[in-house]
Design a protein with these regions (language model features):
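N-terminal signal-anchor transmembrane segment
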Residues: 1-45, 60-69, 361-363, 377-381
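Helix-loop-helix junctions and helix-breaking kinks within/between transmembrane helices
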Residues: 18-30, 65, 72-81, 165-170, ...
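Hydrophobic transmembrane alpha-helices and their immediate junctions
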Residues: 189-193, 217, 221, 225-228, ...
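Transmembrane alpha-helices of multi-pass inner-membrane enzymes
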Residues: 34-39, 217, 221, 354-364, ...
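TM-adjacent membrane-interface loops and short helices in multi-pass inner/ER membrane proteins
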Residues: 259, 266-303, 308-311, 315-322
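A membrane-periplasm/extracellular boundary helix in multi-pass inner-membrane enzymes
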Residues: 119-128, 207, 227-269, 282-286
C-alpha cells in the first residue's frame, strides 16, 4: 500500500507540480523520480523491457543531434528531468498494476486529477468565485485569471480555458480521462460513470481542443462497443449526451473562434497554420539531418504540431526512424487489441480502457506536440498499463493451458486407454 500511495503522490507531482523548486535547479519532481526509481528496483528489479530499450536508442541519436547543434546541456537537462520521469512513471505503473493489482488505483488517481482539472477549467470559463480556493490551492495565478475574465467577452471569443495543465495538455488529458470515466468493473456503465463523463466532456469542450474532442468521442464509442453488455442502450445514452452538448454549443458557442491564435479560421494561415508549422519543421530537418529540436526553437520557430515531424526534429534521421518504428508498433498493438476485443471479447475491461485511452493520446499526437518523443508522462503511463495488463493476460492464459495439460495427463494415467 505504501508504494501505491507514493506512486499517487509522484504522479500528481509530475502532472501538476513538476516545476516546484526545492533548492537551486532541483525540483520536487527530480527528488521523487530518484526515490521512485530506487523503490521500483527494490520492488520488482530494474524493468528494462523491449520498449524502453528501443526508446534509449532514440535518446542516443537525440543526444547526438543536440551535441552537434550546441545544445547538449539543454538535452541532458531534459533527460534528467522529463525523460527520466517518464521512464519511472512507466516502470512504477507496471509495478503497481502487476505486483499490487493496482489497475483501478492508477485509474482513480488519473481521474481525481482530471476532475480537478475539469472543475478548474469550468471555474476559469465562468469566473465563478467558488473556484478561487481551488485555483489558489493548485497554484494557478489568480491575478491573471481575473484579468482574463474581465477582458473576455460573454461568449467563447478569444477566451483561453486551460484548466490546470494548459490548453493543449488539457485537451490530451481530458480526452483520455473521458474514456477512463466509463470504466466499470461490473461491465455496465452506471449513472455515476455518465455523470463523471459529462463533467469531463463539458470541460473538454470549454478547453476548445478540437483533436481532443474528436478523440474523446471516438474513444467513448470504441470502448462502449467492445465492453458493454447492452451496447445499443449504452450508445443511445452516449448519443443523448452528445446531443445535449450540441444544443449547448449551438446556444452558447457562436463565438467559438479563438481569434488570437486563429485556430478556427484561415486568416493568418501563413504564420500560425498547422501545415505551415509542419513544413517549417520539415525544412529545418532537411537542413539538419542530425536533428536538434532546441536549435529549431532557438531560431524562433514554433513546434510543428505533428509527431511525424517531431520525431525527426528530436531524434534526427536515425532517431526519427527508430521513434516512428516504436509509434507504429504501439499503434499496431492498440489496433490488434481492439480487433481481438471486437471479434472474441477475450480481453479484460481494464486492458480495454487503458488501450482506448492510450489510442486517444496517439490520435492527439498526430495534431499536437506532446508525444512519446517529448517524454509526455501520460503517454508512458497508459502504454505501461497496456503492456503490463497484456503480459498478465498472456501469463494467465499460459498458466491455464499448463493446468489443463497436467489435468489431462493425470486423467490418462488413472484411466489408461485399453485397445
Amino acid at each position: 500500500m505504501k508504494f501505491k500511495i507514493a506512486f499517487a503522490i509522484y504522479l500528481i507531482v509530475c502532472l501538476l507540480y513538476y516545476t516546484l523548486p526545492v533548492f537551486g535547479p532541483v525540483s520536487l519532481r527530480h527528488i521523487l523520480t530518484l526515490i521512485m526509481l530506487v523503490w521500483c528496483i527494490f520492488e520488482q528489479g530494474f524493468i528494462f523491457d523491449k520498449f524502453l530499450k528501443w526508446f534509449c536508442v532514440f535518446l542516443f541519436f537525440s543526444a547526438i543531434g543536440s551535441i552537434v547543434t550546441g545544445y547538449a546541456s539543454v538535452f541532458f537537462s531534459r533527460l534528467l528531468g522529463t525523460y527520466l520521469a517518464a521512464f519511472v512513471i512507466y516502470m512504477s505503473t507496471k509495478v503497481v498494476i502487476k505486483k499490487y493489482n493496482g489497475g483501478r488505483w492508477v485509474l482513480s488517481v488519473v481521474l481525481i486529477v482530471a476532475v480537478l482539472n475539469a472543475l478548474t477549467a469550468i471555474g476559469q470559463f465562468y469566473g465563478n468565485p467558488i473556484a478561487t480556493f481551488l485555483l489558489q490551492l493548485l497554484r494557478v495565478d489568480m491575478s491573471e485569471e481575473m484579468m482574463e475574465f474581465y477582458e473576455n467577452t460573454e461568449d467563447f471569443h478569444g477566451r483561453y480555458v486551460g484548466g490546470l495543465l494548459g490548453i493543449v495538455t488539457s485537451g490530451y488529458f481530458l480526452s483520455g480521462a473521458c474514456v477512463l470515466a466509463l470504466y466499470n468493473a461490473k461491465k455496465k456503465i452506471s449513472v455515476y460513470n455518465w455523470l463523471l463523463f459529462a463533467v469531463l466532456f463539458f470541460a473538454l469542450f470549454l478547453v476548445q481542443e478540437r483533436s481532443g474532442l474528436g478523440a474523446a468521442i471516438l474513444g467513448a464509442f470504441l470502448y462502449i462497443m467492445v465492453n458493454t453488455v447492452n451496447s445499443k442502450n449504452a450508445i443511445f445514452r452516449l448519443v443523448f449526451v452528445f446531443v445535449i452538448a450540441i444544443v449547448v454549443i449551438s446556444r452558447y458557442g457562436g463565438g467559438l473562434v479563438d481569434w488570437r491564435e486563429m485556430r478556427y479560421s484561415t486568416v493568418g494561415f501563413e504564420d500560425v497554420g498547422r501545415a505551415n508549422l509542419s513544413m517549417k519543421g520539415w525544412h529545418y530537418f532537411l537542413d539538419n539531418l542530425m536533428g536538434g529540436i532546441d536549435g529549431f526553437h532557438a531560431a524562433g520557430n514554433r513546434d510543428p504540431h505533428t509527431v511525424f515531424v517531431n520525431v525527426f526534429l528530436y531524434g534526427g534521421m536515425f532517431g526519427g526512424l527508430v521513434a516512428l518504428g516504436i509509434i507504429f508498433s504501439q499503434l499496431r498493438k492498440v489496433l490488434q487489441i481492439l480487433y481481438e476485443s471486437f471479434r472474441k471479447k477475450n480481453h479484460s475491461l481494464m486492458l480495454n480502457v487503458y488501450n482506448v485511452a492510450f489510442f486517444c493520446y496517439i490520435l492527439n499526437s498526430f495534431f499536437h506536440n506532446a508525444s512519446l518523443v517529448s517524454g509526455d508522462v501520460m503517454t508512458f503511463l497508459l502504454f505501461g498499463g497496456v503492456n503490463v495488463l497484456l503480459e498478465m493476460e498472456k501469463a494467465e492464459s499460459c498458466s491455464q493451458i499448463e493446468i489443463d495439460d497436467n489435468l489431462s495427463n493425470n486423467i490418462n494415467s488413472i484411466n489408461p486407454i485399453v485397445e
